[in-house]
């Protein structure tokens, strides 16, 4: 590979940070990604695909909404490649042939996905060099930490990882598929229990003011969209509710707690007051199955299905595979798996990131819960108040990492890729640890 691609001054590297909900793309060394795209596409029966908010948010008859990334892993590579190419060529206005690309990956990314990522970089995007960086390590670097315990709460995954001297420790890694989208599911069930149907914005032609608790007075457009598009838009309403109404109590929530009610207006103009639900729904992140205030019965542990749906133990949903743990328990499991000698360093460098961690009260509650678990320890939580730093942590870390002068020796060149045609996984495991 030529020195131009190693140097970093002549040609800027590009950083791609794919997530289940958002994909961030930008230039190495910058402090914010140039392009943040939904990790979804609008797909038509003739094979056409649309990307970007301005296209997939607009209703189109027959357009299916597809997400190529599930629980942090790429599942549909055709869609993923088109998404990355759209971001690079249409948004960044760059030619991937001219830029080395650092791409982030979760620590538990399957070996076959790692190989496929490498092949995609060289065969589909045809970049001159690439590197696969752990998202957990990158997020720690974004906070200036080489050793840390990372609490990452995203859309589909909650993970706690121990990072020591820049490497994620296998034995301390904890992850489960219960996070922001699961909170949406619980909100959806809460509204169904109230016999309330969410009408997303695209269906509302006009609306008139109504009193709180009264049915909407609106004119709806005829629906000619697919179920996947409709549900995609409904999820956006749930996300808005979380941003406006959801609160996480600084102590375990009790039904006896006095709650200030908050009004939420739905897209069709209907207005609803939310009281205890503001705390009850996100409380599941810390105490899964915390429904005592709803049904006057002891809470049942939440189970996780193979389809990553959420149910109660007595639900009709079958094929449950694992019990959901609260975030403090995930954290405790992570620390207990690590060597005693490094635990103090981990506890003194707890980093919080991920979009779901931005819910009001999250960091304080985590601080209180961990202080109870480790009363004699020097506990320090680093939770940036900047939305970009918290949401884009792994991209920012990748930007920092790839801009270091010492990083040039880590790039995998096209020549190396071609030389390891029979065993590319070995190349990845040797270089991208």
UniProtKB/Swiss-Prot annotation:
Gene that this polypeptide is encoded by: alp5
A single BP term in Gene Ontology: chromatin remodeling
Cell compartments where the protein resides: Nucleus
Family affiliation: Belongs to the actin family. ARP4 subfamily.
Assembly information from the UniProt record: Component of the NuA4 histone acetyltransferase complex, of the INO80 chromatin remodeling complex, and of the SWR1 chromatin remodeling complex.
Domain of life: Eukaryota
Cellular-component GO terms for this entry: H4/H2A histone acetyltransferase complex; Ino80 complex; NuA4 histone acetyltransferase complex; nucleus; Swr1 complex
Region spans: Disordered: 289-317
Role summary: Chromatin interaction component of the NuA4 histone acetyltransferase complex which is involved in transcriptional activation of selected genes principally by acetylation of nucleosomal histone H4 and H2A. The NuA4 complex is also involved in DNA repair. Is required for NuA4 complex integrity. Component of the SWR1 complex which mediates the ATP-dependent exchange of histone H2A for the H2A variant HZT1 leading to transcriptional regulation of selected genes by chromatin remodeling. Component of the INO80 complex which remodels chromatin by shifting nucleosomes and is involved in DNA repair.
Keywords: Activator, Chromatin regulator, DNA damage, DNA repair, Nucleus, Transcription, Transcription regulation
Biased composition (Polar residues): 302-317
Stated name of the protein: Actin-related protein 4
GO molecular function: chromatin binding
């Amino acid at each position: 590979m030529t020195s131009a691609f190693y140097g970093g001054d002549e040609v800027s590297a590009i950083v791609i940070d794919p997530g289940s909900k958002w994909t961030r793309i930008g230039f190495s060394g910058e402090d914010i990604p140039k392009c943040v795209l939904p990790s979804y596409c609008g797909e038509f029966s003739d094979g056409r695909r649309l990307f970007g908010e301005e296209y997939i948010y607009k209703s189109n008859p027959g357009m299916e909404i597809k997400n190529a990334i599930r629980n942090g892993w790429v599942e549909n590579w055709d869609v993923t490649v088109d998404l990355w190419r759209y971001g690079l060529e249409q948004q960044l206005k760059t030619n991937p042939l001219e830029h080395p690309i650092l791409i982030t990956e979760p620590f538990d990314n399957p070996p076959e996905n790692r190989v496929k990522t490498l092949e995609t970089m060289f065969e589909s995007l045809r970049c001159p060099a690439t590197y696969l960086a752990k998202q957990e390590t990158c997020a720690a670097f974004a906070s200036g930490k080489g050793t840390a315990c990372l609490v990452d709460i995203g859309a589909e995954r909650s993970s706690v990882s121990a990072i020591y001297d820049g490497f994620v420790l296998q034995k301390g890694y904890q992850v489960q598929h219960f996070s922001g989208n699961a909170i949406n599911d619980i909100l959806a069930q809460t509204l169904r229990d109230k016999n309330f149907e969410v009408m997303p914005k695209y269906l509302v032609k006009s609306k008139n003011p109504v009193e709180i608790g009264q049915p909407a007075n609106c004119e709806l457009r005829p629906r000619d969209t697919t179920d996947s598009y409709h549900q995609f838009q409904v999820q956006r309403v749930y996300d808005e509710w979380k941003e406006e109404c959801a609160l996480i109590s600084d102590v375990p929530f009790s039904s006896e707690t006095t709650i200030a009610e908050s009004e939420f207006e739905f897209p069709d103009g209907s207005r609803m007051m939310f009281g205890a639900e503001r705390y009850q729904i996100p409380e599941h992140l810390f105490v899964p199955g915390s429904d005592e205030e709803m049904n006057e019965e002891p809470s049942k542990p939440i189970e996780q299905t193979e389809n990553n749906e959420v149910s109660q133990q007595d639900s009709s949903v079958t094929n449950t595979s694992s019990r959901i743990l609260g975030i403090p328990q995930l954290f405790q499991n992570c620390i207990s798996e690590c060597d005693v000698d490094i635990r103090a360093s981990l506890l003194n460098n707890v980093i919080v990131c991920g979009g779901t961690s931005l819910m009001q009260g999250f960091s304080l509650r985590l601080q209180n819960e961990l202080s109870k678990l480790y009363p004699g320890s020097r506990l320090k939580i680093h939770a940036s108040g900047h939305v970009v730093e918290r949401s884009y942590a792994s991209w920012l870390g990748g930007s920092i990492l790839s801009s270091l002068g010492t990083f040039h020796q880590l790039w995998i060149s096209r020549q190396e890729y071609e030389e390891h045609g029979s065993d590319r996984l070995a190349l990845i495991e040797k270089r991208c640890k």
